[in-house]
Amino acid sequence: LIQPEPNYYNYWCSQVHGLCHEDTDDAPVFPKVWAQIEPLIENLPLVAHNKPFDEGCLKAVFRVYQMDYPDYEFYDTLCVSRRVLPDLENHQLQTVAAACGYMLDNHHHALADAEACAWIAREIL
């Protein structure tokens, strides 16, 4: 977990993600976590299911800490899923994951969502 700035969770976010400020009181702030993550990414592309949302969040945290945003190549599994799986009832992460053979049991948990997105990317990108 990363401590957000400010370390505040509104009711909706707590309901969706199951987190509150006590969960992140002792968590590191973004610049410390980024220093560990950035060398692992190097120049690899990023992948998200709904790129505009995730990239917007990532850009916002870089702005908060006055850090230069590294302009990574960024793929969107949501956009691609609409093109290659047009007959799905919807294109929510859990629906697309299931169509690709992955059962997402803990939706809105960051690691579970990332694993589902990676599975989808491997199947349709």
Please describe what each predicted stretch is:
Residues 1-71, 86-108:
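Conserved non-catalytic scaffold segment of RNase H-like nuclease domains
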Residues 58, 80, 117-121:
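Buried hydrophobic packing segments
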Residues 63, 82-83, 122:
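Arginine residue identity/basic-tract feature
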Residues 68-81:
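Conserved beta-strand -> loop -> alpha-helix junction used to position metal-binding or nucleic-acid-contacting
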Residues 85-87, 124-125:
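Short helix-capping/linker segments at secondary-structure and domain boundaries
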Residues 99, 118-125:
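Acidic two-metal-ion nuclease catalytic site recognized across multiple nuclease folds
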Residues 113:
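Conserved catalytic/binding loops enriched for acidic/polar residues
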